[in-house]
């Protein structure tokens, strides 16, 4: 399919052939007919990408702070690799489209194939022939509304949410500052609400358009008669409400709004404007009220609402972002809004770059609503494309399912120089698949994992997708006779584990490896070489200052990420098995009991594990510590010897009253990948036995049981 994309590193805009997106739960697959360019927002996005590295840093100081913090934690080189991965990426543009449903997995069965729908959402409702959009960001189009009009729906919902925040009453005076596309729609919504509307803009053409389309009394910001016009319009009182829909780097819109508002008036900010609020002479003396309007409305930026498809109760949240979208289309259907006169340009998707020449000012021509049109194309639903990248020449044909930042930083680069051919990279998002394929030299980019399993010549599958898909992809690999490396965790529950175990009992062909990398770190191997000679039981103490992860992060969702016990603590259980050379037989666990709604209690946990050979492991895992404390400390005791690893940056051996320092070179990511490929080349067993992988995974589930019951759990 064709899609407009931007190279975030170079800023280049172009239309490319990409694999069509795959469909997953709570999503709707839509074939676009039209999409709307949001000139203000998208111009800003494009200009950021086209700026220099210093320019990007100035516009996102929060990310600069993250980089500096990451350097302290992971070192300069590892951080540089992460930054390169982020910069060397392709970005989707657009967030307001209209088209036809081609398939749906929405949880309510609301959307049927062939229905006309409007779609919203950055990275979802993109300028592409086909899009996959979360169900709560899709609404049906009324019969008498055209695709062209419906493509305005996202912008309409943004404008409508700004009006709802203003809560205007019949007959109130409302000023709209900024008469671009968003401001023009806002003026029409206010007029439909029975308000007396006044518009201000720096552009004379936008002022005239507002007068023509919505019959809004409007004036240029630079007009010397502005204050007189405001006094006349408001009968000397000032405006009841002011809605700022402008995008401006200066403080002028906020200062002007304070000046022309009435005493106890309200200012609602919808656009991206500077907000240095001057206390004097107006905000304080007029007791002005300032409100923010958040995008399309309630539900925006809530992953549970947008990504999982969980709606808010109608009686308690009347106007969600989806219901705002519906309300906007209802007004269009009733003839209350005139959108056709706001459409100034329409381009076919092949000419999308020309549209952005208008937006960026490369072509000096007035514009308001710019639409992209999607003509018929027989290839728009293809889920795989071949790349022009020069493929690697190894013997082992290798594919990746999932290629996020972790895979791009720690897995794919470590295959370089090994006896592999990078065949196909599969992601849900065609942009990411194409980007990774080109960057690392994969022969093909795809959004359909089944193609890999059906390929008889494919030998190895790396699974680096979201945790809830791991078990399914591992099972398919075993069933199709392919070797599989899956990032932790192996699976999310005992049912999935039992299913994989059953397949492994009859498996004589596939190696299964889980990304428990720490046991492969050189400093860990050196310690283990010493302690493996000691036959008596050992004590292993591990302290992990893991750091806070918000409750709405996908890894914290039990059904998707499994939580940190299943998704992260498995690392350290495997490491304990490595040092004790034994399997867990019993586990004791308890977590904090906090009343904070921000804290996830089992992110802060103390665990004791008894091993079959009499060894003991103690794990303290916390999310409520301070970032300045190094993340991990490991201590191993046995045979009158002590070994220590400090955050995998250095270590020490304490023996015979002497201390021997150990140097560290990473957490074992490159070594684990090399060991896995070597075992395939030589036809030997997996570097980590399935029995050990099974024991580690089962122990994480028993830890959850121990917390729930307050009782120690036996591990069989």
Where are these regions (language model features)?
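Mid-domain Rossmann-like dinucleotide-binding core that forms the NAD(H)/NADP(H) cofactor-binding site
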Residues: 148-223
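Glycine-rich beta-strand-centered segment in the early N-terminal region that forms part
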Residues: 21-36, 45-122, 681
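N-terminal Rossmann-like dinucleotide-binding module
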Residues: 380-440
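Contiguous beta-strand/loop segments that form the cofactor/metal-binding neighborhood of enzyme cores
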Residues: 357, 361-384, 567, 573-650, ...
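Predominantly a Rossmann-like dinucleotide-binding segment in NAD(P)-dependent oxidoreductases
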Residues: 298-316, 332, 510-511, 518-598, ...
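Beta-strand-loop-alpha-helix segment that lines the small-molecule cofactor/substrate pocket
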Residues: 262, 472-516
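Rossmann-fold NAD(P)-binding glycine/threonine-rich loop
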Residues: 270-289, 293, 299, 490-511
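C-terminal capping/lid region of NAD(P)-dependent oxidoreductase domains
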Residues: 4, 176, 193, 236, ...
